[in-house]
């Protein structure tokens, strides 16, 4: 997803973030588009992120108006592996997919998707991306 790659690389050396918009079926999440959002963390933006709640609400309403929903979130880990941190786990909800992208020296090198299980531990998951819709 070029939109996600560009936004997460642009945020380097800080964490950048955004919403994954798409559909959920009985088995997995399908990403239709990525919406870059502002990281409102100011004291440690290089290793923390938080979304602006009002911006998140606007993105959610826009998605719902098109029959879609926020199915997860993506954020970068500057110069670190694409594995959720303890901070990530402490601030995550179980329904959503969380894409963590390793951005090394400003270049996205690897991204992996995770979801919390019932024990509040992240489990890696496959994530379907509708490349046709995502590139529009």
Regions found by a protein language model. Name each.
Residues 1-70, 79-136:
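Conserved beta-strand-loop surface patch within small alpha/beta domains used
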Residues 73:
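Conserved, mostly hydrophobic/aromatic
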Residues 76:
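Residue-level "edge-of-site" marker
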């Amino acid at each position: 997803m070029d939109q996600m790659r560009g936004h997460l690389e642009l945020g380097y050396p800080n964490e950048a973030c955004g919403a994954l918009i798409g559909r959920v079926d009985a088995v997995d999440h399908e990403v239709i588009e990525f919406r870059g959002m502002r990281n409102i963390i100011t004291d440690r933006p290089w290793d923390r992120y938080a979304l602006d709640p009002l911006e998140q609400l606007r993105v959610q309403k826009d998605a719902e108006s098109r029959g879609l929903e926020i199915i997860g979130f993506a954020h970068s880990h500057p110069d670190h592996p694409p594995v959720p941190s303890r901070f990530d786990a402490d601030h995550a909800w179980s329904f959503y997919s969380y894409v963590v992208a390793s951005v090394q020296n400003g270049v996205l090198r690897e991204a992996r998707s995770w979801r919390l299980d019932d024990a509040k531990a992240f489990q890696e998951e496959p994530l379907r991306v509708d490349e046709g819709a995502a590139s529009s």
